[in-house]
Amino acid sequence: ILRCLVGSEMCIRDRVFTVPEELNPIIYSNQKLLYDALYHAASSTLNELAKDSKYLGADIGYICILHTWGSAMNYHPHIHTIVLGGGLDKDSKWKDTGGKFFLPYGFIAKVFRGKYLCELKSLWNDSKLEFHGTAEKYQNHYCFKELLGECYKKDWVAYCKETFNGAQSVINYLGKYTHRIAISNHRIKSMTEATVTYAVKDYKNKGQWKEKTVPGEEFIRRFLMHVPPKRFVRIRHYGLLSCRNKSKKMAHCRNLLGCKKYISALKNRSATEMIKLLYNIDVCRCSSCGGKMVSHLPDKHTPSVLAHMRC
């Protein structure tokens, strides 16, 4: 899909859609349904506002990625949307607003709020929701209505996290950020028979790293909260970047903008060349003597073993 992105001339942004923490219990009890609702609300918001001539008046393309965690592995479901900086108008001509993002931050959050809560209410009315743990009280009509009222009063957050310049920066972002899990090994600092200590970002202190220690069972509980439902698709493509449109319409966009098609630096490379290019590790060089390694295959009289490298 990323080979369909245009070159360095196009501005690409990461728009983040979040929900208030009051919804966390009911979302966690209905992960598949209410994660899908996040995608529905985010995509409907972007499509509707982008097509409005007051903002852009064009069909846009974007990628949606679900994240469910905060730095401390707390439950924080939100959607990242990587949005092209323009789109095709009704005459199939490219239209953008220069370097400025075409949708107002405050208004987009209000539209997203309305669409998400509308789908949530519809699911409740159709008795499609389950209620577990602290969400059990929302089976009651009055409690659920009170929850909706609280969420409508709140200012939801839909902010622009990062601006990309061209396809390569998007690829770097996707590779390093969107495909990660709730925590990586290097953040786990120490453990005992009873506790685990790991690094978290303190956003109240300018994003400084600090260490947090929790019981082992609590660490496992936090990690398992972020295992997605079976066969759940976390990365989804829409508009100009959808599978149906990406080949023809993105080629048309490149022609209109005079951009070169992105060609991966890894194309037609061998596995050893890819490792060298990505990690600067030469697997064909002996780590002990520095000599060049060659493949060594055993002869027919030697017990069958895998081929290995020798210098």
Labelled PLM ranges:
Residues 294-299:
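Short Cys/His-rich "knuckle" micro-motifs
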